[in-house]
Amino acid sequence: MKLILTQEVAGLGGPGDVVEVRDGYGRNYLLPKRLAMPASPGAVKQVALIKRAREVREIRDLDQARALRDQLEALPVTLPARAGSGGRLFGSVTPDDIAAAVHAAGGPKLDKRRIEISGPIKTIGSHQVTVRLHPEVSATVSVEVVPAS
């Protein structure tokens, strides 16, 4: 089944991409959640026009993403979390927690889906987190997890 994505879908692509998926995945997941629309010839032409306009904006976005990367990498992010003896956290730090900590530290609001954690953060200390700002630009943010008082 050919579909046009209306939102970013992990493993498939971004908005405007024409993708070929299995019928069940498209019919039961992508279409009901409005993540995609059927790929008719008229819709494909319209998407091509939108993509051309997006390419012009993307050059500008790439410069903004690079500036944002520099800002994020220089930002000291401290995240207070409840911890027991030995420095182990009760639970773990989620991408949503990191996005809130970056915003509280004076950074921009980040989409939690763009934050990639290599493994669960369950200890106090400094941890490296990757933030995908643009398909070509990623920022590595140092998050200092401290015990909450």
Swiss-Prot record:
Transmembrane ranges? none
- Recall the GO molecular function terms of this protein's record: rRNA binding; structural constituent of ribosome
Give a Gene Ontology cellular component term annotated to this protein.
Answer: ribonucleoprotein complex
Write out the entry's keywords from A to Z. Answer: Ribonucleoprotein, Ribosomal protein, RNA-binding, rRNA-binding
Name the Gene3D superfamilies for this protein: Ribosomal protein L9, C-terminal domain, Ribosomal protein L9, N-terminal domain
Against Pfam families, the record matches this protein to:
Ribosomal_L9_C (PF03948), Ribosomal_L9_N (PF01281)
Q: Name one GO biological process term.
A: translation
InterPro entries in the record, alphabetically? Ribosomal_bL9 (IPR000244), Ribosomal_bL9/RNase_H1_N (IPR009027), Ribosomal_bL9_bac/chp (IPR020594), Ribosomal_bL9_C (IPR020069), Ribosomal_bL9_C_sf (IPR036791), Ribosomal_bL9_N (IPR020070), Ribosomal_bL9_N_sf (IPR036935)
Task: Report the function annotation for this chain.
Answer: Binds to the 23S rRNA.
Family classification: Belongs to the bacterial ribosomal protein bL9 family.
List the protein's name. Large ribosomal subunit protein bL9
- Source species: Acidothermus cellulolyticus (strain ATCC 43068 / DSM 8971 / 11B)
